[in-house]
Amino acid sequence: MADKQISLPAKLINGGIAGLIGVTCVFPIDLAKTRLQNQQNGQRVYTSMSDCLIKTVRSEGYFGMYRGAAVNLTLVTPEKAIKLAANDFFRHQLSKDGQKLTLLKEMLAGCGAGTCQVIVTTPMEMLKIQLQDAGRIAAQRKILAAQGQLSAQGGAQPSVEAPAAPRPTATQLTRDLLRSRGIAGLYKGLGATLLRDVPFSVVYFPLFANLNQLGRPASEEKSPFYVSFLAGCVAGSAAAVAVNPCDVVKTRLQSLQRGVNEDTYSGILDCARKILRHEGPSAFLKGAYCRALVIAPLFGIAQVVYFLGIAESLLGLLQDPQA
Protein backbone atom coordinates (compact mmCIF):
# COMPACT_ATOMS: atom_id res chain seq x y z
CA MET A 1 0.00 0.00 0.00
CA ALA A 2 3.00 2.26 0.31
CA ASP A 3 3.24 2.65 -3.44
CA LYS A 4 -0.40 3.59 -3.86
CA GLN A 5 -1.08 7.30 -3.37
CA ILE A 6 -4.60 7.92 -2.12
CA SER A 7 -5.97 11.25 -0.97
CA LEU A 8 -6.78 11.66 2.71
CA PRO A 9 -10.53 12.22 2.08
CA ALA A 10 -10.64 8.98 0.09
CA LYS A 11 -8.88 7.10 2.89
CA LEU A 12 -11.35 8.42 5.43
CA ILE A 13 -14.39 7.60 3.29
CA ASN A 14 -13.14 4.11 2.46
CA GLY A 15 -12.43 3.36 6.10
CA GLY A 16 -15.83 4.66 7.15
CA ILE A 17 -17.77 2.68 4.54
CA ALA A 18 -15.90 -0.50 5.41
CA GLY A 19 -16.49 -0.01 9.12
CA LEU A 20 -20.23 0.57 8.74
CA ILE A 21 -20.71 -2.51 6.55
CA GLY A 22 -18.54 -4.71 8.75
CA VAL A 23 -20.10 -3.72 12.08
CA THR A 24 -23.63 -4.23 10.76
CA CYS A 25 -22.75 -7.76 9.63
CA VAL A 26 -20.91 -9.06 12.69
CA PHE A 27 -22.15 -7.06 15.70
CA PRO A 28 -24.26 -9.89 17.25
CA ILE A 29 -21.13 -12.06 17.42
CA ASP A 30 -19.26 -9.20 19.08
CA LEU A 31 -22.02 -8.96 21.69
CA ALA A 32 -21.67 -12.68 22.42
CA LYS A 33 -17.89 -12.23 22.74
CA THR A 34 -18.27 -9.47 25.32
CA ARG A 35 -20.75 -11.42 27.43
CA LEU A 36 -18.69 -14.62 27.31
CA GLN A 37 -15.47 -12.79 28.24
CA ASN A 38 -17.11 -11.11 31.23
CA GLN A 39 -18.37 -14.38 32.70
CA GLN A 40 -16.25 -15.41 35.65
CA ASN A 41 -16.20 -18.73 37.46
CA GLY A 42 -19.43 -19.30 39.32
CA GLN A 43 -22.82 -18.48 37.87
CA ARG A 44 -22.63 -18.84 34.08
CA VAL A 45 -25.53 -17.50 32.07
CA TYR A 46 -24.22 -18.65 28.68
CA THR A 47 -22.32 -21.79 27.71
CA SER A 48 -21.30 -20.86 24.16
CA MET A 49 -21.69 -18.27 21.43
CA SER A 50 -24.80 -19.93 19.99
CA ASP A 51 -26.34 -20.34 23.46
CA CYS A 52 -25.72 -16.64 24.15
CA LEU A 53 -27.33 -15.51 20.90
CA ILE A 54 -30.36 -17.80 21.31
CA LYS A 55 -31.01 -16.64 24.88
CA THR A 56 -30.51 -13.01 23.88
CA VAL A 57 -33.09 -13.27 21.09
CA ARG A 58 -35.58 -15.07 23.36
CA SER A 59 -35.31 -12.60 26.21
CA GLU A 60 -34.42 -9.30 24.54
CA GLY A 61 -35.72 -9.76 21.01
CA TYR A 62 -33.86 -9.65 17.71
CA PHE A 63 -32.61 -6.12 18.29
CA GLY A 64 -31.22 -7.22 21.65
CA MET A 65 -28.31 -8.65 19.66
CA TYR A 66 -27.54 -5.10 18.50
CA ARG A 67 -27.38 -3.45 21.93
CA GLY A 68 -24.53 -0.97 21.73
CA ALA A 69 -24.45 -1.04 17.94
CA ALA A 70 -25.41 2.63 17.67
CA VAL A 71 -22.19 3.60 19.47
CA ASN A 72 -20.11 1.48 17.13
CA LEU A 73 -21.90 2.68 14.00
CA THR A 74 -21.35 6.29 15.08
CA LEU A 75 -17.68 5.98 16.00
CA VAL A 76 -16.47 3.14 13.76
CA THR A 77 -16.12 5.52 10.80
CA PRO A 78 -13.47 7.73 12.44
CA GLU A 79 -11.89 4.70 14.15
CA LYS A 80 -11.40 2.62 10.99
CA ALA A 81 -10.54 5.71 8.97
CA ILE A 82 -7.80 6.66 11.44
CA LYS A 83 -6.45 3.10 11.57
CA LEU A 84 -6.24 2.55 7.81
CA ALA A 85 -5.14 6.09 6.96
CA ALA A 86 -2.49 6.12 9.70
CA ASN A 87 -1.06 2.81 8.54
CA ASP A 88 -0.93 4.06 4.96
CA PHE A 89 0.70 7.31 6.10
CA PHE A 90 3.39 5.59 8.17
CA ARG A 91 4.11 3.10 5.38
CA HIS A 92 4.55 5.97 2.94
CA GLN A 93 6.85 7.85 5.35
CA LEU A 94 8.96 4.76 5.99
CA SER A 95 9.28 3.77 2.33
CA LYS A 96 12.14 4.96 0.14
CA ASP A 97 11.49 5.56 -3.56
CA GLY A 98 8.59 3.12 -3.55
CA GLN A 99 10.75 0.20 -2.41
CA LYS A 100 9.16 -2.69 -0.53
CA LEU A 101 9.19 -2.14 3.22
CA THR A 102 11.20 -4.40 5.47
CA LEU A 103 9.28 -6.44 8.03
CA LEU A 104 10.52 -4.17 10.83
CA LYS A 105 9.24 -1.05 9.06
CA GLU A 106 5.90 -2.74 8.37
CA MET A 107 5.61 -3.52 12.07
CA LEU A 108 6.52 0.08 12.98
CA ALA A 109 3.81 1.36 10.63
CA GLY A 110 1.29 -0.98 12.24
CA CYS A 111 2.40 0.14 15.70
CA GLY A 112 1.82 3.77 14.74
CA ALA A 113 -1.64 2.98 13.34
CA GLY A 114 -2.66 1.08 16.48
CA THR A 115 -1.48 3.91 18.71
CA CYS A 116 -3.41 6.55 16.76
CA GLN A 117 -6.72 4.70 16.71
CA VAL A 118 -7.13 4.39 20.51
CA ILE A 119 -8.16 8.05 20.60
CA VAL A 120 -11.53 6.87 19.30
CA THR A 121 -11.45 3.17 20.18
CA THR A 122 -11.22 3.56 23.97
CA PRO A 123 -14.39 5.63 24.56
CA MET A 124 -16.24 3.64 21.89
CA GLU A 125 -15.42 0.33 23.57
CA MET A 126 -16.10 1.77 27.03
CA LEU A 127 -19.68 2.69 26.13
CA LYS A 128 -20.33 -0.37 23.96
CA ILE A 129 -19.29 -2.84 26.67
CA GLN A 130 -21.68 -1.35 29.26
CA LEU A 131 -24.58 -1.61 26.81
CA GLN A 132 -23.68 -5.13 25.67
CA ASP A 133 -23.15 -6.58 29.14
CA ALA A 134 -26.29 -5.19 30.80
CA GLY A 135 -28.38 -8.18 29.69
CA ARG A 136 -25.89 -10.71 31.07
CA ILE A 137 -25.81 -9.08 34.51
CA ALA A 138 -29.61 -8.87 34.72
CA ALA A 139 -29.90 -12.50 33.61
CA GLN A 140 -27.42 -13.68 36.23
CA ARG A 141 -29.23 -11.86 39.01
CA LYS A 142 -32.59 -13.27 37.90
CA ILE A 143 -31.24 -16.83 37.89
CA LEU A 144 -29.62 -16.44 41.31
CA ALA A 145 -32.84 -14.99 42.71
CA ALA A 146 -34.83 -17.91 41.30
CA GLN A 147 -32.37 -20.40 42.77
CA GLY A 148 -32.64 -18.74 46.17
CA GLN A 149 -36.42 -18.93 46.12
CA LEU A 150 -36.37 -22.58 45.08
CA SER A 151 -33.85 -23.48 47.77
CA ALA A 152 -36.10 -21.91 50.37
CA GLN A 153 -39.08 -23.85 49.01
CA GLY A 154 -37.16 -27.09 48.46
CA GLY A 155 -38.24 -27.24 44.82
CA ALA A 156 -36.44 -28.19 41.63
CA GLN A 157 -34.75 -25.55 39.50
CA PRO A 158 -36.61 -24.66 36.31
CA SER A 159 -35.00 -23.33 33.15
CA VAL A 160 -34.71 -19.58 33.56
CA GLU A 161 -34.09 -17.41 30.51
CA ALA A 162 -32.43 -14.01 30.64
CA PRO A 163 -34.91 -11.26 31.42
CA ALA A 164 -35.31 -7.98 29.66
CA ALA A 165 -32.53 -5.88 31.17
CA PRO A 166 -32.62 -2.20 32.06
CA ARG A 167 -31.67 -0.21 29.00
CA PRO A 168 -29.08 2.46 29.73
CA THR A 169 -28.32 4.68 26.77
CA ALA A 170 -24.96 5.80 25.44
CA THR A 171 -25.92 9.42 26.12
CA GLN A 172 -26.84 8.62 29.73
CA LEU A 173 -23.63 6.64 30.26
CA THR A 174 -21.51 9.42 28.77
CA ARG A 175 -23.17 12.04 30.94
CA ASP A 176 -22.73 9.95 34.10
CA LEU A 177 -19.08 9.19 33.35
CA LEU A 178 -18.24 12.82 32.61
CA ARG A 179 -20.03 13.97 35.74
CA SER A 180 -18.40 11.44 38.08
CA ARG A 181 -14.94 10.93 36.57
CA GLY A 182 -14.42 13.63 33.97
CA ILE A 183 -12.96 12.90 30.54
CA ALA A 184 -10.79 10.21 32.15
CA GLY A 185 -13.97 8.18 32.71
CA LEU A 186 -14.39 7.69 28.96
CA TYR A 187 -10.75 6.63 28.70
CA LYS A 188 -10.84 4.00 31.45
CA GLY A 189 -8.85 1.03 30.17
CA LEU A 190 -6.70 3.14 27.82
CA GLY A 191 -3.56 1.21 28.76
CA ALA A 192 -5.27 -2.13 28.16
CA THR A 193 -6.65 -0.88 24.84
CA LEU A 194 -3.13 0.08 23.74
CA LEU A 195 -1.89 -3.30 24.94
CA ARG A 196 -4.43 -4.94 22.63
CA ASP A 197 -4.52 -2.66 19.59
CA VAL A 198 -0.82 -1.94 19.12
CA PRO A 199 0.22 -5.64 19.00
CA PHE A 200 -2.84 -6.36 16.85
CA SER A 201 -1.75 -3.79 14.27
CA VAL A 202 1.87 -4.95 14.47
CA VAL A 203 0.70 -8.47 13.54
CA TYR A 204 -2.15 -7.59 11.19
CA PHE A 205 -0.75 -5.03 8.76
CA PRO A 206 2.55 -6.77 7.86
CA LEU A 207 0.77 -10.14 7.60
CA PHE A 208 -1.95 -8.69 5.38
CA ALA A 209 0.54 -6.85 3.15
CA ASN A 210 2.59 -9.99 2.57
CA LEU A 211 -0.41 -12.28 2.02
CA ASN A 212 -1.92 -9.76 -0.38
CA GLN A 213 1.39 -9.51 -2.23
CA LEU A 214 1.62 -13.29 -2.56
CA GLY A 215 -1.80 -13.41 -4.23
CA ARG A 216 -1.05 -10.66 -6.75
CA PRO A 217 -0.53 -11.87 -10.33
CA ALA A 218 2.82 -10.76 -11.76
CA SER A 219 1.09 -9.03 -14.68
CA GLU A 220 -1.17 -6.85 -12.52
CA GLU A 221 -0.46 -3.74 -10.44
CA LYS A 222 -2.70 -4.76 -7.54
CA SER A 223 -4.27 -7.93 -6.21
CA PRO A 224 -7.81 -8.97 -7.19
CA PHE A 225 -10.49 -8.00 -4.67
CA TYR A 226 -11.01 -11.60 -3.55
CA VAL A 227 -7.32 -11.90 -2.70
CA SER A 228 -7.52 -8.72 -0.62
CA PHE A 229 -10.64 -10.07 1.11
CA LEU A 230 -9.07 -13.44 1.95
CA ALA A 231 -5.81 -11.81 3.04
CA GLY A 232 -7.76 -9.46 5.32
CA CYS A 233 -9.76 -12.34 6.79
CA VAL A 234 -6.73 -14.54 7.47
CA ALA A 235 -4.57 -11.73 8.85
CA GLY A 236 -7.45 -10.36 10.94
CA SER A 237 -8.40 -13.67 12.53
CA ALA A 238 -4.75 -14.56 13.25
CA ALA A 239 -4.07 -11.20 14.90
CA ALA A 240 -7.37 -11.35 16.83
CA VAL A 241 -6.59 -14.71 18.40
CA ALA A 242 -2.99 -13.67 19.13
CA VAL A 243 -4.07 -10.68 21.24
CA ASN A 244 -7.22 -12.22 22.75
CA PRO A 245 -5.70 -12.40 26.28
CA CYS A 246 -5.25 -8.62 26.14
CA ASP A 247 -8.83 -8.24 24.93
CA VAL A 248 -10.15 -10.27 27.89
CA VAL A 249 -8.24 -8.04 30.32
CA LYS A 250 -9.45 -4.88 28.56
CA THR A 251 -13.08 -6.02 28.59
CA ARG A 252 -12.96 -6.87 32.31
CA LEU A 253 -11.32 -3.53 33.20
CA GLN A 254 -13.80 -1.47 31.20
CA SER A 255 -16.89 -3.17 32.65
CA LEU A 256 -18.35 -0.87 35.30
CA GLN A 257 -21.05 -3.25 36.55
CA ARG A 258 -20.25 -6.63 38.11
CA GLY A 259 -22.33 -9.72 38.53
CA VAL A 260 -22.84 -11.39 41.92
CA ASN A 261 -19.55 -12.51 43.54
CA GLU A 262 -17.48 -11.37 40.56
CA ASP A 263 -13.95 -10.01 41.03
CA THR A 264 -13.08 -6.34 40.74
CA TYR A 265 -9.74 -5.16 39.39
CA SER A 266 -7.41 -2.27 40.16
CA GLY A 267 -5.32 -2.44 37.00
CA ILE A 268 -3.92 -4.54 34.18
CA LEU A 269 -1.56 -6.66 36.29
CA ASP A 270 -4.12 -7.17 39.06
CA CYS A 271 -6.70 -8.26 36.50
CA ALA A 272 -4.33 -10.69 34.79
CA ARG A 273 -3.24 -12.20 38.13
CA LYS A 274 -6.81 -12.71 39.37
CA ILE A 275 -7.94 -14.25 36.09
CA LEU A 276 -5.00 -16.65 36.13
CA ARG A 277 -5.46 -17.53 39.81
CA HIS A 278 -9.25 -17.95 39.87
CA GLU A 279 -10.06 -19.11 36.34
CA GLY A 280 -6.88 -20.62 34.93
CA PRO A 281 -4.92 -19.92 31.72
CA SER A 282 -7.82 -20.98 29.48
CA ALA A 283 -9.81 -17.94 30.63
CA PHE A 284 -7.54 -15.74 28.53
CA LEU A 285 -8.95 -17.42 25.43
CA LYS A 286 -12.59 -16.72 26.31
CA GLY A 287 -14.35 -15.32 23.28
CA ALA A 288 -11.38 -16.02 20.98
CA TYR A 289 -13.57 -17.94 18.53
CA CYS A 290 -16.14 -15.12 18.50
CA ARG A 291 -13.44 -12.49 18.12
CA ALA A 292 -11.92 -14.30 15.14
CA LEU A 293 -15.38 -14.51 13.53
CA VAL A 294 -15.86 -10.78 14.12
CA ILE A 295 -12.46 -9.54 13.00
CA ALA A 296 -12.02 -11.76 9.92
CA PRO A 297 -14.93 -10.40 7.84
CA LEU A 298 -14.57 -6.94 9.38
CA PHE A 299 -11.05 -6.48 8.07
CA GLY A 300 -11.71 -8.51 4.92
CA ILE A 301 -14.49 -6.09 4.00
CA ALA A 302 -12.32 -3.14 4.98
CA GLN A 303 -9.51 -4.14 2.68
CA VAL A 304 -11.84 -4.89 -0.24
CA VAL A 305 -13.45 -1.44 0.05
CA TYR A 306 -10.03 0.15 0.44
CA PHE A 307 -8.44 -1.62 -2.50
CA LEU A 308 -11.44 -1.30 -4.82
CA GLY A 309 -11.22 2.45 -4.30
CA ILE A 310 -14.94 3.06 -3.77
CA ALA A 311 -14.28 6.50 -2.31
CA GLU A 312 -12.05 7.47 -5.24
CA SER A 313 -14.89 6.62 -7.62
CA LEU A 314 -17.39 8.62 -5.58
CA LEU A 315 -15.08 11.62 -5.34
CA GLY A 316 -14.38 11.37 -9.06
CA LEU A 317 -18.09 11.49 -9.86
CA LEU A 318 -18.54 14.52 -7.61
CA GLN A 319 -15.64 16.34 -9.25
CA ASP A 320 -16.72 15.42 -12.79
CA PRO A 321 -20.53 15.14 -12.92
CA GLN A 322 -20.44 14.49 -16.68
CA ALA A 323 -18.18 11.47 -16.32
Swiss-Prot record:
Pfam families: Mito_carr
Keyword Nucleotide-binding assigned: no
Membrane topology: Multi-pass membrane protein
Keywords: Disease variant, Epilepsy, Membrane, Mitochondrion, Mitochondrion inner membrane, Repeat, Symport, Transmembrane, Transmembrane helix, Transport
InterPro entries: Mit_carrier (IPR002067), Mito_Solute_Carrier (IPR051028), Mitochondrial_sb/sol_carrier (IPR018108), Mt_carrier_dom_sf (IPR023395)
SUPFAM superfamilies given in the database record: Mitochondrial carrier (SSF103506)
Record-level GO BP terms: aspartate transmembrane transport; L-glutamate transmembrane transport; malate-aspartate shuttle; monoatomic ion transport; regulation of insulin secretion
GO-annotated cellular components: mitochondrial inner membrane; mitochondrion
Coiled-coil intervals, chain numbering: none
Residue windows of the Solcar repeats: 6-93, 101-214, 223-312
Domain of life: Eukaryota
Subcellular location, record wording: Mitochondrion inner membrane
GO molecular function terms listed in the Swiss-Prot or TrEMBL record: amino acid:proton symporter activity; L-aspartate transmembrane transporter activity; L-glutamate transmembrane transporter activity
Disease cited in the entry: Developmental and epileptic encephalopathy 3: A severe form of epilepsy characterized by frequent tonic seizures or spasms beginning in infancy with a specific EEG finding of suppression-burst patterns, characterized by high-voltage bursts alternating with almost flat suppression phases. DEE3 is characterized by a very early onset, erratic and fragmentary myoclonus, massive myoclonus, partial motor seizures and late tonic spasms.
PANTHER family (alphabetical): MITOCHONDRIAL 2-OXODICARBOXYLATE CARRIER 1-RELATED, MITOCHONDRIAL GLUTAMATE CARRIER 1
Function: Mitochondrial glutamate/H(+) symporter. Responsible for the transport of glutamate from the cytosol into the mitochondrial matrix with the concomitant import of a proton. Plays a role in the control of glucose-stimulated insulin secretion.
Family according to the record: Belongs to the mitochondrial carrier (TC 2.A.29) family.
Protein's UniProt name: Mitochondrial glutamate carrier 1
Protein species of origin: Homo sapiens
Organism lineage string: Eukaryota, Metazoa, Chordata, Craniata, Vertebrata
